[in-house]
Amino acid sequence: MNAITKSFTGRKRIRKSFGRIPEIAPMPNLIDVQRASYEAFLQMNVSPDSRQDAGLQEVFRSVFPINDFAGRGRLDFMSYEFEDPKYDVEECIQRGLTYAAPLKVILRLTTWDIDEDTGSRSIHDMKEQPVYMGDMPLMTDNGTFIINGTERVIVSQMHRSPGVFFDHDKGKTHSSGKYLFAARVIPYRGSWLDFEFDAKDLIYVRIDRKRKLPVTTLLYALEGANYLAQREQKIAEGGDVEGLDIRGMDQDEILSYFYEAVPFTRLGGEWARPFDPDAFRGLKLLSPLVDADTGEVVAEADAKLTARMVRKIAEKTRVVQVGRLDILGRFLAYDLVNENTGEIYGEAGEELTEDRLAALEEMGITELPLLSVDGSHGPWIRNTLAADKNSCRDEALIDIYRIMRPGEPPTKETAEAMFHGLFFDQGRYDLSAVGRVKMNMRLDVDAPDTLRVLRKEDILRTIKIMCELKDGRGQIDDIDNLGNRRVRSVGELMENQYRVGLLRMERAIRERMGSVDIDTVMPHDLINAKPAAAAVREFFGSSQLSQFMDQTNPLSEVTHKRRLSALGPGGLTRERAGFEVRDVHPTHYGRICPIETAGRPNIGLINSLSTYAKVNKYGFIETPYRLVEEGVLQDGWKYLSAMEEEKLVVAQADAKQDDQGRLTDELVSVRRSGDFRVVPPDQVTACDVSPKQLVSVAAALIPFLENDDANRALMGANMQRQAVPLVKADAPLVGTGMEAAVAHDSGATIVAKRRGVIDQIDGARIVVRATDEAGATQGVDIYRLRKYMRSNQSTCINQRPLVKVGDTVHAGDIIADGPSTELGELALGRNVLVAFMPWNGYNFEDSILISERIARDDVFTSIHIEEFEVMARDTKLGQEEITRDIPNVGEEALRNLDEAGIVYVGAEVNPGDILVGKVTPKGESPMTPEEKLLRAIFGEKASDVRDTSLKLPPGTTGTIVDVRVFSRRGVDKDERAMAIERAEIERLTKDRDDERGIQERSFYNRLRERLIGQTAGAGFKGIRSGTPITEEVLDEHHRATWASITVTSDEVMAELEKLRGEFKEATRRIDARFDSKVEKLQRGDELPPGVMKMVKVFVAVKRKLQPGDKMAGRHGNKGVVSRVVPVEDMPFLENGQAVDIVLNPLGVPSRMNIGQILETHLGWACANIGASIGDMVDEYQRTGERKQELLDRLHEVYGDVIFNEDVATLPNEQLIELANNLRKGLPIATPVFDGASIPDIEEMLEKAGVNKSGQSQLIDGRTGEPFERQTTVGYIYMLKLHHLVDDKIHARSIGPYSLVTQQPLGGKAQFGGQRFGEMEVWALEAYGAAYTLQEMLTVKSDDVSGRTKVYEAIVREQDDFEAGIPESFNVLIKELKSLGLNVELEQSGL
C-alpha cells in the first residue's frame, strides 16, 4: 500500500491506496503534448546559431533565398528573433487582444553586377536588415492561446502517415470477387501516386487521382540505366552533363527488373531447362519429369510435386527435360539478335506460339532466354507492356502531360519539366522525414531521411511488391494501425499554415524585385508581411482545429488539450468515415483511450490520448514498456511506437513477479502482433509499466472502472468534463490517485515555481521569498490569485490560498486551490449520503430525489459569471454617450448607477435593470410648431436622443462582481475609469514595494553577514580605518549607509561590489516592470474602429440545485432532479442521520455499472472511519487524552508503510491537522484495474464497525416505520452537470419576428416562441376548436395587421377583432409569381 503523494498538500491529507502494482515510470506532464510541440516550432529560447532545421526555422529556410527574375538580386534569410509581447496574458484577456510577440526576421539582400558580354556576375552590394513579419501568437503556460481575448486550444490531428501503402478492394469492385491490389505513395505535400490492378490483371497508374495510364508509361518516363551510367561516367571525367540526351527505361530494362531470364537449351532435339524448386513446387505433372543429363525419370506423370519431393529432386538434378507444351505461351526475356547480320529474330516480351517456335528451331537457335513466368510469378508487367501504346520516353512524357494538363499543347521541354516537378523537385514534392522512414521500412530500402523526393528505385520497388502481393506473397497494410497514422500537433499545423503564408508572400516579393531599382532598395521595402500574418490569423481564428477551450472545469481543460481529432483540413469527414477507422485497434493499447471518445456522430473520430502516451519527433504515439530479458524485468522503461512494438511480446502490468523482478507464473498472458496469447516467461520481451496506461485521464479518474460496462464508462468519462465547479468542493472519498496529477498539471491551481518561504498572503495574492537550500534569498515571486473570473463556459474561476505566512514550499508544490480543486486534488463534485430504494415514484426512470439539506446548505450550489458589454460608437448623427442622464427613466431605475452611468460593483440586479446607461442621437424628425416653441424656450432637449442602455436580460438575477471601462486613446476618461485605474496602480505599487522590501531585507542581511568580522578600510565617515566591524558598530549606523563601508580584504570588497550590483539590477528590473505596467494602464486602449468607449459588466449568478437540473455519478449513472423533499420526510438511519439522495435501484442491473455499488460500500466505510477519527480528535483536543488511540487507529487504517513513513513522524500540530482533514472520511485511492477487491471492501467495512453487507436499516421519515428490509446506503461522489434548468427555461410574450415570413423566431438564443406545428394543428382540428386554431395561425403568428388590431382592441378593452391574411400566404403567392403564375384575389365579383 503506497501513499500517492508527499507534496505540501499531500502531507495535509494522506490518501490510502489499494494499488498493488508499483508505479515504475512517472506519468508525463498532462499538457506537454501542446507545450513541447509549440516550443519545438518557435525555438524561442534557442540562440539563432543553435536552432535545428525544424519548425519556423525550416519554413524560412525552405522559402528563402528568393531570386528575382533577372538574376540580379537575391534575398536571403539569416535568422529570426522575437521581441517581448506588448501585453501579458491577463491584459490580453481583459482587453480582448491576442497574446502574441512581434517576429523580426533578419534578411540579407545581395545584388550583382552582370557583365553583358560574358554574362559573368560580380557582387555589387549586400544589405542586412531586421524586418517586422507580423505578430506570432504565443502559448500560455497552460498550453492555450489567447486570441481576441478568448482562450483557445489547437487540437492535435490524426492523419494517415506519409509513405507507401498497399491494399486491395476486398473483392468488391469486380463481379468475380477477385482481389484487385493497389498501392499508394502519399507524400507530406505534393502529388499522390496510385498504382492499381484492373479486372484484366493489367497494372495502371494514376497521378493525383486523374485518368489512369498503363504503369509502363511511367516506367518509360523514368531515366534508363544506360543514360544514368553515361551520366556517371561524364561526371567522373569532369564533363558537362547538360547536353546529354535523357533516355528512359526500355522494354529490356523493365522486363529484366521484374523477371529473371530462364535459359531453355536444346539438347539432342529436346528442350531442357535448369531445375528451379520454386517454379516446380505444387505442380501436377502431365508427363514424366526426366533428368536431361542422365535420362533418368525423377518423377512420374500425374504426380503432384510436394515441397519435400522438390527438395529431394534438387539434390541430384540440375537440368530437366521439358516438352514443347511447356515452352509455348512463354515470353522472350530480351531481344534475340543475329550478331553477324543484326537481324532480330524475336523481341523482348514476345509470346512463343507454335509457329514462332518452329521458325526459331529452323533457324538453328539452340538457346532461348525466357521470362520466369510461372505459377508463382505472374505475367502482369509483361502484359501491361504489350497493352501500352507508348514505346519510348518522349511518347510517355507527352501522354502524362496530356493527362495532367488537358487542353495545353505539349512540347518535349514542358513535358520534361512538368514530370520532373511532380515527384523529383524538392520545392514541390516532400515526403518528409517520416515519409522517407516509413518508405524505407516498407520497401526494405536504405535512403537517408534527408532525401525527401522519390527515387527511381522507390517506384520500381513499389510496383514489384504489388506484383508479389498479386502472386500471393506478402501482406497488405492495415491503415488503421497506429504505425500508419500519425499526430500533427499544434507546432506542425502552424508550420504548414505559415508556409502557405510565406509562399503567398514569395510571389509578391519576386514581382516587387522586378519592378523596383534593386540597387537602391532595402530588404524591408520588398517585404509586405500581410499574407503571412493573415495566414496565422486565419488559422487561429477560423480553422476547424482551433477551438474555443472547454473550460467548464480543470479536467475538461486537460482533456481538450489531449484530444486527437481525425477531422479537420486534410483529415476525414464525418460522412465518409467508415466503421473501421472509428473502431478500437490493438495498437491503441497505451496510446489512445478505448473508452473516452466523443458522442454519436463523431464516435471514434475524436479520441483522447492515454495517460502515459507521448508523441515522438516523427508524430507517432509512443507508450512506455519495461523490457524483459530471460523472464526478468529490467530496470527503467522505454517509450515505443506501434511499429517498434510489433516485434515484442508484451506481458500485462499485473503479471506475477518475485522480489528480483523474475516472472513467476508458468504461463504468462501476453499481447503479440495484436493477439492475446499465453507464453512461457522466457519468451516475454516487455511488460506494461502501469495498468492505467491503457486509459485516458478522464477514464483513469473513475474508481472501479473494471466493474463498469464500457458504454457507461464512456458516459462517466464524458460527464466528468461537464461537472460545474461548486462553491464548496470536496475531493472524492473514493478516488483513483489521479486527482492530484490533474489538479497540478491543469493550471487551475497555483504551483510554486521555486523553493521559498511564504512572506505575505491575502485573498488576492501570495508573496514568496525564494530561497536556496541554505535559506539565502534568491528573489521574490508574487503569485496573483484569480478572483471571480469568468471562464469560457461562464463558470466561475476563483483561487484560494492553501498556505500561511512562514510555511516553506518547494518547487512544484500547490500553494493555492482553484475551481474544482480541494487541497491540491481535483474535486468535481461532493460526497453525499445515498440510499438505493424507490420513493413514491419520484425516482422513476433515473429521476433523482434530493433532500432539502442539499439546497439549504449550498452542497451543490455553483456560481456562474455572465459578461455583458456595451460600446459607445461615433455615429453619423453624433457620438453615443455613456451617461446617467437617460430620457424618460425614473430615479428608481437609476438607483444602482454611479455618476458616470455605470452600475456599482456589489449591486444586486434583476431582469430589466439598467447596467450601463447609454443614449444614442436620434435622426432629425420634422418638428411641430409646439416643439419648436419649447426648443426656443428651453434650448437643447433630451428628446434628441433615445435610450439604448444595456439592460439585464430576462432569466438572470445576480450580483455585479466586476466592471471594466475601456476608453479610446485621446478620449478623456470618465470618473469611473479613473477610479478603476487608480485602484489598479495602487495594487501594482503595493506589489513593487513588497518586492523591493524583500530584496532590500535580503541584501542588507547578506551585507551584514559579509561585513561582520572584517576590518574597516579608509573612506567611510563614522568608522575609523582598521576598526573591526561588529554587530554593535553596524547598528550605530543606518543600514542605508552600509553599502558605502569599505574593508581591507580585496576578496570581500569584490563580493560586496557584486552584491551591490545584483541589488541595483534587481531594483532596476522591478521599477522598469512597474513603469511599463503603469504606462500601459494610462495609455488608453485599442478599441475597434468607430468605438469611443467600451464597458464590460460581470454579473455573478448563484445557482442552487433545483428540480430539472442534471446530476451524475462517475459511472455513467445520470439523472434529473425530480423533487426536493423536506429533511424530515427523507428516509433516515438508526442514528437519526437523514440520507441526502435517493436513487432508483433499477438503474443498476440493466446498465451493468456495478462500480457505483462498490463505491457506495467503500464510501460508507471511509465515512465511518473518518467519523471515528473525528471523535478521537475532538476528545484529544478537549481533554488531551486518546492520542495513542488516535495513532493506533491511523496505524490500523493506513498500514505499516504509510504510517511509519508519513504519519508517525508528524509534529503534533500537523498530526491534528491531518486528523481533522480526515473527519469527513478517510480518502482512499482505488486505481483502475488495480483497485480494491471485494475482500478489501469487506475488511474496510469491518474496520469501520458497520455491517459487512454494506446495507443498513432505514426508517421512513414520514411514518417513522422501519422499512421492510435493509437498504444499500453509502457515500457516492455526485456531480452537478452543466445542463441547468435555469439555462434552458424560457418564456416569451412579444419578441422578434422573421423578416420574410413574419413568424416569431425559434429558440432561447433568439428570444423565440414555441412552434405550433402540423401535428398540433391536427389536435385542435380534432377538438373542433376553430377560433383557437384561427388565432394560432394568424394573429399569434404572422398576420401583421391582425397583430396590431388585436393590440388596439385589448387597449380599448374590446373583445372583438378580425383575422387578416397570414404573411406566409403572401410569401406563397410571391413564390408562385416567381414561377410565372400570377395569383390575384378578385373581390369585385363577390
Swiss-Prot record:
Which cysteines pair up through disulfides? They are none
Xref: SUPFAM superfamilies: beta and beta-prime subunits of DNA dependent RNA-polymerase
Question: Which PROSITE patterns would you find in this protein's record?
Answer: RNA_POL_BETA
- What molecular functions are annotated in GO for this chain? DNA binding; DNA-directed RNA polymerase activity; ribonucleoside binding
Looking at the UniProt entry, the stretches that span the membrane are none
**What role does this protein play?**
DNA-dependent RNA polymerase catalyzes the transcription of DNA into RNA using the four ribonucleoside triphosphates as substrates.
Q: Which family does it belong to?
A: Belongs to the RNA polymerase beta chain family.
Name used for this protein in its record: DNA-directed RNA polymerase subunit beta
